[in-house]
Amino acid sequence: MQAMAELDDFFAKKDKKKSKNKTKFVTADEMVKNLEDGTKREVVKPKKPEAAAGGVAVVGENENSGTKVPESAPPVEEEWKEFEEEQRKDYSGLKIGQLSTITAQESAESRATRVPTAQDGGNYDEDDEDSNGYDNADVNKERVGHGPWKKVVPAEEVMQIPVPVEVEKPSSKTYVSPALRYSQQAGSGLGGGTVGGALRPRRAAPDITNTEFFPTLSAARPEEQRKKKNEPAFEEVRHGSRFQRVQESTAAPVAASNRFQSLDDEAS
């Protein structure tokens, strides 16, 4: 029996392989059947109503008895929101003055400096302070003095006398002769000038004929150019292209006469 079962499995596997290797041809009738089977399998599922704020939706057999979502439910917020710039409100028309707050340090200082008066019966009672640790009398005084109805009186400004600032005169770039400069100093009373190294009296007219204060161009002498010791001297040459220099012969003169008579004797 076991051998028969193994044979059946073997042949069944072979049949499956053969069916896979065969070419698959689908006829028109088979296509229609497949389409009909697909439409039957598809089951229309009703959409589940979404539960909204203010109402609960029931799905299943009790849909008719379930509560409906009210129409006045707020719409679902979108994912993106438009950015709106916040407009600053203008409070300038309210005419609000300076508002000051009382700190614990200020109230402690006021309690320390408080002196019992006749209204207090000469006694200082700490029960006058409220639960926050502030003195009611001091708080009332400060509120009266610092409320919005209290106009802030500006302090009197001390008139400051402006100090004159000495402005330095810009120095002119024009040339001023020494005589004119001394005359200006003498006219302003700063002191007298000097004439030839000697002090001249104040407010004295300068000497126009003095060449030291009023130099002239005719008095100027051109300085002669000094020649250097090792500087070579140059000769002035005119018509150098026409001038031809003849070299003199330096050879010794030849004596033509016979200074010895020995030659004559030998000849005879």
Curated annotation (Swiss-Prot):
Coiled coil: none annotated. Residues 76-85, 123-132 have a biased composition (Acidic residues). It comes from the Eukaryota. Residues 98-107 have a biased composition (Polar residues). Residues 51-61 have a biased composition (Low complexity). Residues 40-145, 184-268 are annotated as: Disordered. Residues 40-50, 221-239 have a biased composition (Basic and acidic residues). GO terms for cellular component: cytoplasm. Transmembrane segments: none annotated. InterPro entries: CDV3. Belongs to the CDV3 family. PANTHER family: PROTEIN CDV3 HOMOLOG. This is Protein CDV3 homolog. It comes from Drosophila yakuba.
